[in-house]
Amino acid sequence: MPDLKRAIGLMSGTSMDGIDIALLATDGENWIERRASASMDYSDGFRARLKAGLVDARAIKDRAERPGLLRQLEHDLTLLHAVAVHDFLHEQGLQPHEIDVIGFHGQTVLHRSNESLTVQIGDGALLARETGIPVVYDMRAEDMRHGGQGAPLIPAYHAALAANLPLGLKGPVVFVNIGGISNLTYVGEDGALIAYDSGPGNMLIDQWMELHGHGRFDPGGATAMSGSVDRNTAHRYLEHEFFKGNHRRSLDRGDFAIPAKGELNLADGARTLAFVSAAAILKSASHLPARPRTYVVSGGGRKNGALMDELTALAERQGAHVIDADNAGFDGDAMEAEAWAYLAVRSLCGLPLTYPSTTGCDKPVSGGVPVRP
């Protein structure tokens, strides 16, 4: 039996809807025992503060800067994560001393890969003090210091999952995470690992629904299911410079914008943006060394029926199968949080978090800042 560490992963993604929490035991390599998971939603008021913080973050020139609301926001965000950990431990009947490490992502407020600048607010030292558990945080920065894009970081975890795929899943396999921004991880039959952001995920759909006063997202894709794809609008998105050439890069929330209000009706806009999210995955996958046979989909976007219908139809045209991560034996909601727990253990062990084929860094790079209570 390898030396396993109990780790909690905390993820607050680009959708800014709350905190995902996951517990696993791992050696930081191929031994993974997935345990419990949970989530905690942000209040509408706190979500509004996060969005205001994105505006303040535009002024950042150095990643240590916290202009405007960001200093207080970072403090309050960290305390919310501490509450989430305490509640989770209570629900699971665990004590802080039974957890070896927390992997703390924080909230990305700025990501400019072309400037080697990424900023995630979240005070790891404060979280360690509040929870009484060692914390590893700020896991993207070291990758950027070595010429990487700082994203995506989840591929190391995907590679470990791919080593234990359920029977019947044919490779090459692509793990797709559809959060605010989508990313994919290709695991070749020869073990090749390639990853990059693939395009907008839920982000544009969520913004479109909010623009029309219809909530924060499209539940189940119901609005999109009643609409039709506007091909001209979809074509415009898919001709974006992000998709051109062979050089892949990571994305920021500001790289794509929603159509103007009135350009499309609510349902057609939602359907068009769902199609764009799906088509972006296949378009980005065209840069891979071999055509995928299976797409394993995690993240909130897999719950949008229209997006999944479009993705399934597009993939089937290429002879590929699309499967919800839950139906493949994984946890589609907790996969990113699980990854952050796994990466925290890898960081403590000095193992790489990123590779030249996943972020463009100049060599396999570990990372993260460890702090103790």
Curated annotation (Swiss-Prot):
SUPFAM superfamilies: Actin-like ATPase domain. Keywords: ATP-binding, Carbohydrate metabolism, Kinase, Nucleotide-binding, Transferase. ATP binds at G13, T14, S15, M16, D17, G18, I19, D20. GO terms for biological process: 1,6-anhydro-N-acetyl-beta-muramic acid catabolic process; amino sugar metabolic process; peptidoglycan turnover. It catalyses: 1,6-anhydro-N-acetyl-beta-muramate + ATP + H2O = N-acetyl-D-muramate 6-phosphate + ADP + H(+). Gene3D superfamilies: 3.30.420.40. The keyword Kinase applies. Pathway: Amino-sugar metabolism; 1,6-anhydro-N-acetylmuramate degradation; Cell wall biogenesis; peptidoglycan recycling. Transmembrane segments: none annotated. It is an enzyme of class 2 (transferase). InterPro entries: Anhydro_N_Ac-Mur_kinase, ATPase_NBD. Catalyzes the specific phosphorylation of 1,6-anhydro-N-acetylmuramic acid (anhMurNAc) with the simultaneous cleavage of the 1,6-anhydro ring, generating MurNAc-6-P. Is required for the utilization of anhMurNAc either imported from the medium or derived from its own cell wall murein, and thus plays a role in cell wall recycling. This is Anhydro-N-acetylmuramic acid kinase. It comes from Brucella melitensis biotype 1 (strain ATCC 23456 / CCUG 17765 / NCTC 10094 / 16M).
